[in-house]
Amino acid sequence: YNGFYEPFQTTTSADFEVNGDNILNYENYNFVGIEFNQNVPTIDASEMTELTMDIFIPDPFPFGSNIDIRLVDAGSDGSIGGGDDSTVSYTISTSLTSSPIMVQAQWLEVNIDITGLANRDNLGQIIFASDNPQRPSGFYVDNIYLRR
């Protein structure tokens, strides 16, 4: 996989390790993705119902901040952008209606229902994006997995 898929963005990567656990560390955040469809097979998650990950935001961020998370299935052609992709999106924010609500310096477990994806047998990307100028400057991601 490529944990730092990087076109059209300012985000930098400063990953680190804690007790043998690799933590993705995204800095100067606006857009970044994890890509697992180049030089490796896509993931068949047709039996899975949820994408789970932990997110930690170390620095203060303005009210109204958000992180949009998108899971992309490459479709039957196995190619992102091939015309038959499907995407499910999920947003965490400072809004009281967000679940979980973004907080500083605390690990947040994010559970994303993926049953709405038209296809789940060629997963190829996880995208973290925010067009909102009110966004965290960076965040950590750990424990990314699919489950039923």
Where are these regions (language model features)?
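Beta-rich carbohydrate-recognition modules and glycan-binding surfaces
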Residues: 1-148
